[in-house]
From Swiss-Prot:
Gene Ontology terms: biological process: regulation of DNA-templated transcription
Protein name: Probable transcriptional regulatory protein Sare_1779
Gene3D superfamilies named in the record: 1.10.10.200, 3.30.70.980
Annotated keywords: Cytoplasm, DNA-binding, Transcription, Transcription regulation
UniProt subcellular location: Cytoplasm
Length: 249
C-alpha cells in the first residue's frame, strides 16, 4: 500500500498550527467554489459539490464559509476568482514521482512556487507525460475503522463498482473507477457506514520503497509544496512502513 495514501489520511490531524489550519480551510473552500462553478450550486444534482461540501464539513470548516463559497461559485454572490486547474509533474528525492495539482488564478505564480519548492528540497520539474503515466485516476473513499470491519465495507461496496478495499491502519481505503464513486459512496450510506471523504484522486501503479531518511525528505518536500496557496493536492508514489510513518509523524 502506498505510504502516501496513509500519510494523506493523517496529515490533517497534524494541522495544529493556526496557519496550517487556515490554509487547509482556504483550500477546502476553494474546492467547494470551483465545484459549484463547474456543475451548479445544487449538491443534489452535483455529486462533486456534494463531496466537496462533506469534506469541508468533516474538517470543521464553518457552514457560513461553505455557503458563501457555493454562492460565489454559482454566481449568486460577487467575489469569485477565475480559478484554473493546472497539473505539474516532477520528481522528489530518491526518484519519487510527483503530480502537483494546482487550483490557481495566476499560472505563472503557481509554476514559480512549485519549481522553487522542488529545487530547494532535492526535487526537479519533469516533462509533461514523464510522470503522469505512473498514476491512474480513481474514486477514493476513506472509511474510519471505528465500529466497522473490512468485511462490512466489502459487503457494502462490492456490487456498487468497488475494485478493492485497502487497510491503511486507522482507516479503510475503497478504490473504484471515478464514474462509480457516487454509487460506492451511496452504498456505504445505505449500509449505515460512515465515511471520512469521497473524491476523485490519483493513485500510483508502482511505489518506491523509502528508508527513514528518504521518507523524511519527501514528507518535507510535500509539506513545502502544500504550503503554497495554489497547490490543492500532491500525489506521490513512495512507500513506507506504518512504524516509520508513526515515528516521523
Amino acid at each position: 500500500m502506498s505510504g502516501h495514501s496513509k500519510w494523506a489520511t493523517t496529515k490533517h490531524k497534524k494541522a495544529v498550527i493556526d496557519a496550517k489550519r487556515g490554509k487547509m480551510f482556504a483550500k477546502l473552500i476553494k474546492n467547494v467554489e470551483v465545484a459549484a462553478r463547474t456543475g451548479g450550486g445544487d449538491p443534489a444534482g452535483n455529486p462533486t459539490l456534494y463531496d466537496a461540501i462533506q469534506k469541508a464539513k468533516k474538517n470543521s470548516v464553518p457552514n457560513d464559509n461553505i455557503d458563501r463559497a457555493v454562492k460565489r461559485g454559482s454566481g449568486l454572490e460577487a467575489g469569485g476568482a477565475d480559478y484554473q486547474t493546472v497539473m505539474y509533474e516532477g520528481y522528489g528525492p530518491n526518484g519519487v514521482a510527483l503530480l502537483i495539482e494546482c487550483l490557481t488564478d495566476n499560472r505563472n505564480r503557481a509554476a514559480t512556487e512549485v519549481r522553487t519548492a522542488l529545487t530547494r528540497n532535492g526535487g526537479s520539474f519533469a516533462d509533461a507525460g514523464s510522470v503522469s503515466y505512473l498514476f491512474s485516476r480513481k474514486g477514493v473513499v476513506i472509511v474510519a475503522k471505528a465500529g466497522t470491519t473490512e468485511d462490512d465495507v466489502m459487503l457494502a461496496v462490492l456490487d456498487a463498482g468497488a475494485e478493492e478495499v485497502n487497510d491503511l491502519g486507522e482507516s479503510f481505503e475503497v478504490l473504484s473507477e471515478p464514474g462509480d464513486l457516487v454509487a460506492v459512496r451511496t452504498a456505504l450510506q445505505d449500509a449505515g457506514i460512515e465515511y471520512e471523504s469521497a473524491e476523485s484522486s490519483l493513485v500510483p501503479s508502482v511505489s518506491v520503497p523509502l528508508d527513514e531518511d528518504g521518507a523524511r525528505k519527501i514528507l518535507k518536500l510535500i509539506d513545502v509544496l502544500e504550503d503554497s496557496d495554489d497547490v490543492q493536492n500532491v500525489y506521490a508514489n513512495f512507500d513506507v512502513s506504518d512504524e516509520m510513518l508513526a515515528r516521523l509523524g
